[in-house]
Structure formats: C-alpha cells, structure tokens
C-alpha cells in the first residue's frame, strides 16, 4: 500500500492533468494576451513592467550621479605628465629675433665670473658671448634692469639654432635623453631648457611654430642686490645624435608683460659639453688667432686693405739683408778667432763675387772673341808632310 502511494506522488506532477490544474490556478492578468492567430500582439508586451524597470535602473543612476562627485579637485590623484599646453601669447615671426633690445627698462643679462679649470661645471666667455656648461647642471643667469617692470611681467627662455640653415627647426632633446627618467614631473621630456627651484615655471609650446619655451614670473631683486637670478639647466649635450647634433644654439631671454608684449631681449650662445673649461679655452684661443690674422679695419678701407697686406708680405721676405749689421757675443778667445776668420772668408768671397760680376758686365760684348782665342791657343797645329815626289 505504501509503495503505491509513493508511486502516485511521483507520477502526479508529471501527468497532464496536474499541469492543467496548475494552469487554471494562475490569475488572468499574468497571461500574455494573444491575437486570433495565437501569436503575441507585439514585442512591447514582453518588456518588464514600468515599476520593475525603475527599480532595476535605480542603482545604475545612483552610480552615474555619484561618479562625478567623487572626482573633486582636492582628492584627484596625480596624473602622468601631459604634453605642454600651447601658449596664448603670439610670437612676432616664425624665427625669433636674436638682436639685443634693452627697451625702456634697460634689460640685459649678466653671468658669474669663472675660470677655465677642468672641474668647472659652468663658465661664460665674454669675448665669445658664449656659455659653456655640463649636462643637467645649474647655470645661474642674472637679469639686470634700470627700472622696475610693471606687475605681471614674465621672463621667457627659448632655444633656437644659430645658423641660418637650421633656424626654422625646433630645438629639442635627443630620443635617448627623452626616455631618461630625469624629470621633476613638471617639464615635458622633449624640452631642452628647464628652470630649477621655481614652482611657478610654465613649459609652453607655441601653436604656430611649435617652439618650446619656459616662462617664469619676474621677481624684483632682493634687498641689497642689483639683479635677479634664474637658474637654468640644459638637458641634452650639443653632440647628441638625433638632437642638436653639434649644431650651435642660442638662448633668447625676453622680458614680456602680462599680455605678451616685448619689454626687453637679450641672447647668448650655449655649448653643452663634458669639459666646459677646456672647450672655452680652446675656442678663445682660436678666436684670438683669427683676430690676429685678420685684424679689424675701419669701414671703407676693408676692400683695399686685403690686397695691400697680401702683397706687402712677399716684399718683406725678398728684402736683401746685405746692408744690415748684427752684433754677436762670443764667449772665449778661441771661438772668437774662429768666427772672425769665418767672417773674413765670407767677406772675401763676397768681394770676389762682386769683382767677377763687374768684369763680366764690362766684357759682356766680347764673349765670342775670348772664346775663339782660348780655343785657338790649345788647338794642336796641323803639319803637312812633304814626300820625295813632291815638287
């Protein structure tokens, strides 16, 4: 009996009668409406009710609203270094001018006096107007003004190539130094010039020329000082392949107001090398030799002075020295007698040479006659033999 009841409990849910009973128990609102053909009326009937859909979409909307609120300026995580922003200050031309302009404020640059020792890391040559420095070493540059500029004045530093065939190119670091992790998080890796010790430095790229520059606010000199000092660093060697590639560069320092108007300009040449003292000494010696070989002449006489100097040098070499006398100090009597005899022999030789030259000039009109006489003297006479049969 118990086995039959257990079999019925298993078979009832699987029978068709049980399913029809359960189907009739469902409320009519939960059954999908059908058309006369028995197919669903539309796809919209398959969607969830509106209250259920709003309940499910609620958490997503809350997340979308709360996500922007979490990104506040104070709690924002530090992002990686982004490319430098384009400067809103327009430049006057595609190639910046390098001519010195002091303006109304007497703006000009100055440098510390340093020697040419091998251990020096930064040295400036006045005669060459050139700064020699090592890679990534501090180079103090002095800003001098005769009167205080207006508030909001800025100081811009920009590097350009010195030679005309390279001026249109942008000065940038080589690919090797760009990949080096030597940045402070503020300067872009492709910028050559950096400012040290100034948190207000801005590294900018021009929209039109794509040139790199660094701008810092102008600070008046401190009490007891006559100038303001800015510490620059050059982050690539002058000999790096793919960068400057041994091409000389100029650093242009400009004084600008808050609107970008020029107030003053000054420039100097830069060489980034391993031994600044040695390179400065070598270039100054070459420059000095060049000046001695080609001295400066007043304007208007340069065209005539060049042939005169070249033609006068051979004349000085061909100038006879027979009429000049020299005094020679000799130690010892024996040496003196030897040199005296040598001098007398040379004097006698010169006298005989002069006499012979005089005789040759006097008898130059009779060379053939003398020659004929000399040959006839030594000529053997011919004798005709007379035989017995001759008359």
UniProtKB/Swiss-Prot annotation:
Motif ([KR]-[STA]-K motif): 368-370
Low complexity bias (residue ranges): 77-90
Covalent cross-link site, Glycyl lysine isopeptide (Lys-Gly) (interchain with G-Cter in SUMO): 384
PROSITE patterns: P53 (PS00348)
Site (Interaction with DNA): residue numbering on this chain: 118
Needed co-factor(s): Zn(2+)
GO molecular function ontology, one term from the record: RNA polymerase II cis-regulatory region sequence-specific DNA binding
Region: Basic (repression of DNA-binding), residue numbers: 366-385
Annotated spans, Interaction with WWOX: 64-108
Residues found modified as Phosphothreonine: 18, 282
Residues covered by region (Interaction with E4F1): 254-292
Stretch list, region Transcription activation (acidic): 1-47
Compositionally biased spans, kind Basic and acidic residues: 281-295, 350-362
Residues covered by region (Disordered): 65-90, 281-324, 350-391
Location(s), subcellular: Cytoplasm; Nucleus; Nucleus, PML body; Endoplasmic reticulum
Function: Multifunctional transcription factor that induces cell cycle arrest, DNA repair or apoptosis upon binding to its target DNA sequence. Acts as a tumor suppressor in many tumor types; induces growth arrest or apoptosis depending on the physiological circumstances and cell type. Negatively regulates cell division by controlling expression of a set of genes required for this process. One of the activated genes is an inhibitor of cyclin-dependent kinases. Apoptosis induction seems to be mediated either by stimulation of BAX and FAS antigen expression, or by repression of Bcl-2 expression.
Record disease entry: p53 is found in increased amounts in a wide variety of transformed cells. p53 is frequently mutated or inactivated in many types of cancer.
Protein name: Cellular tumor antigen p53
Source organism: Rattus norvegicus
